[in-house]
């Protein structure tokens, strides 16, 4: 690669910037002060142009994109014509209620500790849930396996086995391997 060729591709300081790029730079320049804008290199300006384009594309597609940091806290309108500073809902952020331990107890069922099963009694203890929707009713009738137990019986490997052993298949026909000698050994 020739070193002179790389310098020929770079724009010089006084070079004319194409109109399309200049328009994109003008869109971005309003987010910065004149001093900041003059200190920036062309490559930094291009990065900001692409950041704004990606943000606009994501929001047009309906995704919730994070507003780039350079676009925040400036008195400008966004690409859809909405004025950020005059938005009445701007400062009203929705506060989500925090989950406390008491609320979590109300949502998740209380699981009773398992007692050792007596020899004569085959039925299992079933955890009960307390809360407004269950009012102490049993979740599953005794003697019937729960859904998770059914799933484990059908698909899951047994304890003590390796996780991949249930994936191995048995060969239907016995394979006999023969020892193949090297041609170099036959020459002796």
UniProtKB/Swiss-Prot annotation:
Entries under InterPro entries matching the protein: aKRAB, KRAB, KRAB_dom_sf, SSXRD_motif
Ranges of Basic and acidic residues composition bias in the record: 115-127
Disulfide bonds: none
Keywords, ordered alphabetically: Phosphoprotein, Transcription, Transcription regulation
Domain (KRAB-related): residue spans on this chain: 20-83
Region called Disordered, residue ranges: 113-162
Example GO BP: regulation of DNA-templated transcription
Residue positions where Phosphoserine is found in the record: 123
GO cellular component, one term: nucleus
Stated family: Belongs to the SSX family.
Biological function: Could act as a modulator of transcription.
Subunit comment: Interacts with SSX2IP.
Protein's UniProt name: Protein SSX3
Protein species of origin: Homo sapiens
Lineage: Eukaryota, Metazoa, Chordata, Craniata, Vertebrata
Gene (name only): SSX3
């Amino acid at each position: 690669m020739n070193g002179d060729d790389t310098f020929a591709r770079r724009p010089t300081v006084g070079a004319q910037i194409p109109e399309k790029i200049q328009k994109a730079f003008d869109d971005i320049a309003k987010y910065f002060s004149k001093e900041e804008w003059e200190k920036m290199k062309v490559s930094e300006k291009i990065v900001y142009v692409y950041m704004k384009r990606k943000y606009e594309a994501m929001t047009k597609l309906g995704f919730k994109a994070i507003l780039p940091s350079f676009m925040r806290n400036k008195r400008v309108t966004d690409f859809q014509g909405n004025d950020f500073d005059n938005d009445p809902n701007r400062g009203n952020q929705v506060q989500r209620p925090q989950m406390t331990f008491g609320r979590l107890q109300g949502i998740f069922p209380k699981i009773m500790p398992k007692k050792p099963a007596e020899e004569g009694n085959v039925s299992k203890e079933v955890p009960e849930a307390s809360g407004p929707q269950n009012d102490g009713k049993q979740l599953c009738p005794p003697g019937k396996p729960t859904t998770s137990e059914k799933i484990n019986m059908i698909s899951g490997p047994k304890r003590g086995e390796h996780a991949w052993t249930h994936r191995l298949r048995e060969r239907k026909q016995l394979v006999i391997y023969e020892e193949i000698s090297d041609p170099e050994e036959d020459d002796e």
